[in-house]
A protein has these predicted regions:
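Vicinal oxygen chelate
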Residues: 2-31, 41-136, 143-150
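Short, surface-exposed ligand-recognition loops at beta-strand->loop->(often short) alpha-helix junctions
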Residues: 33-36
């Protein structure tokens, strides 16, 4: 078969990018940079009931994709060469995560039991039931739900 016909046949068999792209939903997934990725995966499982969807690497140096009841996020060890720093390296945070759940009191208590530190307790404020913890890796999580409209 001539080379030109062969390349046309290959292109015909290749999946259409348009078909693949139309099946992808637009989402935003935070990527947490920290120190101790392996320990972080275990913490998020214990604290929030996260499930591990993907992991590359072993020990404490990992890249992982996790899900908390369908809400996905990524984590990895900091990599200064890519300008990704942990809160510990920065001396602070640049983003807070809001975890919206049906029972913020239970999830908050579970996170604290797993090793998170309370920043402020779960209370009712601004039409939300909301509390805030900082995880052992320096990331702040607001755990809450909107109040029901009566």
């Amino acid at each position: 078969m001539p080379a030109s016909k062969k390349s046309r046949n290959i292109r015909k068999r290749a999946p259409s990018r348009r078909k693949v792209a139309s099946k992808i939903a637009t989402t935003i997934a935070p990527w947490l940079c920290l120190r101790g990725g392996g320990r972080a995966v275990e913490f998020y499982k214990a604290a929030f009931g996260a499930t591990e969807l993907f992991r590359m690497g072993d020990g404490d140096s990992v890249v992982a994709r996790l899900s908390i009841q369908g809400a996905e996020f990524w984590l990895s060890d900091e990599s200064p060469e890519h300008h990704n720093f942990s809160p510990e390296s920065l001396g602070g945070i640049t983003v807070r995560i809001i975890l919206t759940v049906a029972d913020p009191d239970a999830v908050f208590a579970r996170a604290v039991k797993a090793g998170a530190k309370e920043v402020y307790p779960v209370t009712e404020e601004h039409d939300w039931r909301l509390g805030r913890v900082v995880d052992p890796f320096g990331h702040h999580w607001e755990i809450g739900r909107p109040m029901a409209d009566d």
